[in-house]
Design a protein with these regions (language model features):
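Arg/Lys-rich, low-complexity, intrinsically disordered basic segments
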Residues: 1-98
Length: 98
C-alpha cells in the first residue's frame, strides 16, 4: 500500500501538498477558496464535480500524482479531511499520513 504524506502547500496560493513515496510533491487546492470539507454544502459539491469533470481531470488511481485527483478526493469527497483520508484508503488502497 503506497503511503502519501499530506503537508501544508509549498506553492503560493495552494492549500495542501502531498508527497508520493517516490518523493514527487503535488500542491493542490486554493488557499483562499472553500471546499466541501469547509462548507459541507452538497449543492456546491455537485457543482464543483460537474465543472471539473468537464476539464478531463484523471480522478482514477492512475491520476494519483495530479492535483485534480487530490482536490477531488481529499477536498470534495467527504465532509471532513479524516473521512476523506479513510475513503481514499478504502477506494484506492492509498494511505495518507498527516
Amino acid at each position: 500500500m503506497p503511503i502519501y504524506k499530506l503537508e501544508p502547500a509549498t506553492a503560493k496560493g495552494k492549500r495542501y501538498s502531498v508527497v508520493s513515496p517516490e518523493g514527487k510533491r503535488t500542491n493542490f487546492g486554493s488557499a483562499t477558496g472553500s471546499t466541501f470539507i469547509d462548507h459541507k454544502d452538497e449543492q456546491k459539491k455537485a457543482a464543483w464535480i460537474a465543472r471539473h469533470s468537464k476539464a478531463g481531470e484523471n480522478w482514477e488511481y492512475s491520476g494519483r500524482d495530479t492535483a485534480g485527483f487530490w482536490a477531488r478526493h481529499l477536498l470534495w469527497s467527504a465532509p471532513t479531511l479524516r473521512q476523506s483520508i479513510k475513503y481514499i484508503k478504502e477506494r484506492f488502497g492509498i494511505k495518507v499520513r498527516t
